[in-house]
């Protein structure tokens, strides 16, 4: 689904939802926008000029992701160091089960090797070599480059070129010279195609991931940008005067003309994490477990002491890339997850594939004949057949019943409703185990608030919270558009990374240590200048730009480094060095405890970065006066039969839009809105606070 959330200057918001249209994402975007405008009562004729009222528009889409999934990007040629022509097909063992469930991870036959974006016949090796210190060992053979360029650009008619040489992150002269030769060949051939260099796209170690990053940029960035331009054009037709913005994987907003657009390839779930971080700053909770239930996947991340960790080598569509991304883990467990019976064991098998939003659950009668989790929600009475997406989508409960009986219940020899509840319990167990086993290892769950969002988040939140002793459990009425809302909570941000290797021994004198870290300072200064100039060119004023140097540090001999925002701008004295390494040690002991800290350890700086930010106006959470505990009459919609714990019960039904801050509700209940549904089991109690946030506690623990 495509969600649009409109936030006004008072912090009020409204959510619109529409089916995603992958062939032209502007269609789904505009339909969702118009639905939101209808909801707040903007007349049709005024909607055609509503763009004049928009200060900014931010789009977090899956254009680049879809391009890679569907293998519909540019025909890309690869020029690389001779002997490394197969680098596009190479990889690491663990990339064969990225995002898979544990059952797939533990069985080799389920593992899948991706199809390379660059086929072997479009890869050319050229003679050159730079060593690990940046020294030229073999000068580049320019005639090799010219021949490779001619074969790829002229003979093969490639639509883009990726250039990836060994050690180019230390010394980029060979890649830049190769690009000059390619442009000359391109000019002679009368063509104009993008040429991407790994030293510009991802100047960091991990050569296979660096190559993948450059190839994805060359393969998918321009096709994805065309989708973004379509959305911008549609907005301008209704009076929007600014440029469309998009979200980058590390939680920043940027112009859609941003050159390294591949950094936005994995931004689909970032909005939710950033929205959770902002929400936490308002309510005063900086330890949050974020859980997003969509149609296809269950995504989870952890905010620890207000910090969202960044993964510099995330998995992306069966490969690893060098692109900073907020840490988030996913499994194929959403409301559209397919339910099948394994013919060998006669057991229930959930996913990992999904109907998603198209063709959707069987009850939508759009061609899908495999039952999904949402069919279970409908059969059990949790979802209202007359209120699916506010009643805009036709639902046929009988179709859902018949297909579920035929394909799930009868093979199991179970009653339809018993089988449906069993499937729901299995899904909730999968979600709970995913959070506790992969996210909260080493953390005390009692210190964390569990936040549920996404269209299916409130629907499954309390069942997968289970008996785990979270500090609190909460959701929001705009959960269905929470990730979109999170986009409005982000600053405008760019960041640049560069690999380095600097070792600081505690026995060094101040002069020796300052001299050793001089390369760090030099790279910081260079990255600062690049980012500053980028933002100035985009129209920002110098006083708006905040630049933060970052160092990635570990103890010598250890495998994992930590991101340390530097409290100082340079490293010219012992005080500067102490400030940086003290910040590292504080972070290290916070994550791994004081007992893990080696005494007198040698520091190893493995990578440096600079983050450039421009603060934006954030949505404001309005404080309301608290009403009576009892919900108003217009919020109470009677009861509905609901199957729970092997029997039918009468559940209280409430209209979410009419509930007020201060209201309290006991389970068994269903609180439904047009874009989401909150299911409240019998053992839970709901309280709405002054910010209209829904807090859930087990009865007896209020």
For every predicted segment, state its role.
Residues 60, 164-167, 198-200, 249-250, ...:
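Glycine-rich beta-strand-to-loop/alpha-helix junction loops that act as flexible
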């Amino acid at each position: 689904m495509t969600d649009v959330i409109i936030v006004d200057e008072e912090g009020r918001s409204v959510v619109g939802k529409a089916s995603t249209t992958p062939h032209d994402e502007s269609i789904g975007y505009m339909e969702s926008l118009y639905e939101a405008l209808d909801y707040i009562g903007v007349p049709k004729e005024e909607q055609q000029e509503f763009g004049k009222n928009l200060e900014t528009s931010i789009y977090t889409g899956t254009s680049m992701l879809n391009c890679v999934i569907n293998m519909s990007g540019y025909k890309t040629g690869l020029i690389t160091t001779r002997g490394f022509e197969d680098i596009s097909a190479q990889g690491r063992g663990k990339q064969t089960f990225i995002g898979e469930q544990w059952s797939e991870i533990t069985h080799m036959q389920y593992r899948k090797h991706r199809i390379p974006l660059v086929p072997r016949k479009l890869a050319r090796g050229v003679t050159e070599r730079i060593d690990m210190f940046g020294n030229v060992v073999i000068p580049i053979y320019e005639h090799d480059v010219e021949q490779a360029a001619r074969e790829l650009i002229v003979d093969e008619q490639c639509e883009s070129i990726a250039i990836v040489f060994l050690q180019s992150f230390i010394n980029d002269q060979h890649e830049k010279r190769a690009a000059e030769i390619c442009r000359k060949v391109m000019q002679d051939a009368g063509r104009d195609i993008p040429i991407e260099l790994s030293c510009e796209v991802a100047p960091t170690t991990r050569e296979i991931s660096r190559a993948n990053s450059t190839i994805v940029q060359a393969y998918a960035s321009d096709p994805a940008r065309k989708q973004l331009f379509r959305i911008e054009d549609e907005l301008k037709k209704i009076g929007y005067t600014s440029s469309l913005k998009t979200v980058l994987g590390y939680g920043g907003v940027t112009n859609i003309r941003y050159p390294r657009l591949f950094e936005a390839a994995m931004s689909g779930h970032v909005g939710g994490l950033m929205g959770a971080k902002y929400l936490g700053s308002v309510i005063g909770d900086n330890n949050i477990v974020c859980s997003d239930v969509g149609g296809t996947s269950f995504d989870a991340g952890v905010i620890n002491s207000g910090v969202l960790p960044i993964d510099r080598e995330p998995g992306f569509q069966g490969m690893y890339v060098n692109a900073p991304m907020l840490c988030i883990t996913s499994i194929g467990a959403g409301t559209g997850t397919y339910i099948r019976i394994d013919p060998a064991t006669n057991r229930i098998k959930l996913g990992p594939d999904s109907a998603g939003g198209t063709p959707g659950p069987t009850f939508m009668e759009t061609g899908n004949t495999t039952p999904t989790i949402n069919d279970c929600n409908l059969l059990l009475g949790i979802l209202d057949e007359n209120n699916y997406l506010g009643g805009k989508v036709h639902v046929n409960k009988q179709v859902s019943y018949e297909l579920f009986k035929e394909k799930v219940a009868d093979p199991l020899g179970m009653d339809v409703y018993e089988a449906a509840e069993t499937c729901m319990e299995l899904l909730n167990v999968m979600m709970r185990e995913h959070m506790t086993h992969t996210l909260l290892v080493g953390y005390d769950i009692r210190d964390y608030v569990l936040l549920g969002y996404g269209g299916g988040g409130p629907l499954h939140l309390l069942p997968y919270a289970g008996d785990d002793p979270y500090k609190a459990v909460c959701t929001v009425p705009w959960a269905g558009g929470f990730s979109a809302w999170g986009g409005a909570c982000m600053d405008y941000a760019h960041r640049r990374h560069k690999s380095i290797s600097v070792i600081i021994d505690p026995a060094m004198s101040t002069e020796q240590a300052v001299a050793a870290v001089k390369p760090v300072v030099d790279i910081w200064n260079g990255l600062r200048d690049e980012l500053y100039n980028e933002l100035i060119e985009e129209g920002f004023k110098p006083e708006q730009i905040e630049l933060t140097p970052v160092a990635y540090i570990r103890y010598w001999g250890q495998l994992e480094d930590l991101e340390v925002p530097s409290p100082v701008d340079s490293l010219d004295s012992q005080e500067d060095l102490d400030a940086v390494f003290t910040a590292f040690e504080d972070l290290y002991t916070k994550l791994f405890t004081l007992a893990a800290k080696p005494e007198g350890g040698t520091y190893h700086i493995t990578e440096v970065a600079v983050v450039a930010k421009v603060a934006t106006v954030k949505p404001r959470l309005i404080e309301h006066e608290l009403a009576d505990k009892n919900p108003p009459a217009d919020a109470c919609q009677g009861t509905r039969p609901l199957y729970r714990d092997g029997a039918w019960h009468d559940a209280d039904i409430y209209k979410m839009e009419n509930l007020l801050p201060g209201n309290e509700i006991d389970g068994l209940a269903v609180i439904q809105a047009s874009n989401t549904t909150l299911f409240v089991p019998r053992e839970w109690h709901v309280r709405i606070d002054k910010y209209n946030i829904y807090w859930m506690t087990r009865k007896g623990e209020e």
